[in-house]
Amino acid sequence: MKQKPAFIPYAGAQFEPEEMLSKSAEYYQFMDHRRTVREFSNRAIPLEVIENIVMTASTAPSGAHKQPWTFVVVSDPQIKAKIRQAAEKEEFESYNGRMSNEWLEDLQPFGTDWHKPFLEIAPYLIVVFRKAYDVLPDGTQRKNYYVQESVGIACGFLLAAIHQAGLVALTHTPSPMNFLQKILQRPENERPFLLVPVGYPAEGAMVPDLQRKDKAAVMVVY
C-alpha cells in the first residue's frame, strides 16, 4: 500500500508590499557588493560560522528532496597543501595547452594564472561533492534526480551565506578535479563539483573593476 505523504502547515514569513519592496531592495544592494576574491587573509574563523554557512546551503531545494550533496570542510594545513599541489598541476596544464586562446583572452582581465596560493592561505576550503546516487546501509543504491541543478542551487545558497557572514569566497573549478575525491577519500558515489576557499579578504585586497549586466540585459517580462 502506498504511504500517504505527510504535510505540515507552511510557516514562512510574509510581508506587506511596502516592506517587501524595502527588504528586497536592501538585499539586492547587499548582494550587489558580493565579489569573488583571490587574495585571502589567514585570519582564523570559528568553525561554528562555517557550520552555519554549510547548513544554510543544505536548505536548498533538490530533486525529490534527495539532497544529493556533501560539503567537505578542510582546515588541515597538510591536506590544503596536497590540494594546492594537485590543483596547480592541473591548472598548469590548462594554462599551457588545454585552454583555447579565446578562453585565455577572456581570463586576461582577471590576471589569473596556474598559481593558486589561496588554497593554502584561506583558513577553510569547502569542497562541494555531488552524489549521483545514495548508498543505503544494506548496500542498495538509490538514484538521485536533477543532481547538477540541485547542487548548483545549493552552491548559490552557500555563496550567499558566506557573504552574509562578512566573509569572501572564490569559486574554483580546476579541471579535471577528481584528485579531490582521492585526497579527501570520498566514496565512489560522490564526485567533486566545486572548490570554495573561504575567509576574510587580505588587507588591501583588490578585485577587478567590473560591471554587472543591467536589468534590461538579464530580465524579460511578459
Curated annotation (Swiss-Prot):
> InterPro entries, alphabetically?
Nitroreductase (IPR029479), Nitroreductase-like (IPR000415), Nitroreductase/BluB (IPR050627)
Looking at the keywords, is NADP present?
Answer: yes
| EC identifiers of the protein | 1.21.1.1
What is the top EC class of this enzyme, as a single word? oxidoreductase
What are the UniProt keywords, alphabetically?
Flavoprotein, FMN, NADP, Nucleotide-binding, Oxidoreductase
- Cofactor field: FMN
Q: Which residues bind 3-iodo-L-tyrosine?
A: E91, Y95, K116
Give the Pfam families listed for this entry.
Answer: Nitroreductase
Note whether Translocase occurs among the keywords.
no
Known catalytic reactions: 2 iodide + L-tyrosine + 2 NADP(+) = 3,5-diiodo-L-tyrosine + 2 NADPH + H(+); iodide + L-tyrosine + NADP(+) = 3-iodo-L-tyrosine + NADPH; 3-iodo-L-tyrosine + iodide + NADP(+) = 3,5-diiodo-L-tyrosine + NADPH + H(+); L-tyrosine + chloride + NADP(+) = 3-chloro-L-tyrosine + NADPH
Query: MF terms per GO, please?
Result: FMN binding; iodotyrosine deiodinase activity
Residues that bind FMN: R34, R35, T36, V37, R38, P61, S62, T171, H172, T173, R212
Question: What is annotated about its quaternary structure and interactions?
Answer: Homodimer.
Extract the PANTHER family matched here.
IODOTYROSINE DEIODINASE 1, NADPH NITROREDUCTASE
The family classification in the record reads: Belongs to the nitroreductase family.
Summarizing the function annotation, the protein's role is: Catalyzes the dehalogenation of halotyrosines such as 3-iodo-L-tyrosine and 3,5-diiodo-L-tyrosine. Likely to also catalyze the dehalogenation of other halotyrosines such as 3-bromo-L-tyrosine, 3-chloro-L-tyrosine and 3-iodo-L-tyrosine. Activity towards 3-iodo-L-tyrosine is much stronger than activity towards 3,5-diiodo-L-tyrosine and 2-iodophenol.
Supply the name of the protein.
Iodotyrosine deiodinase
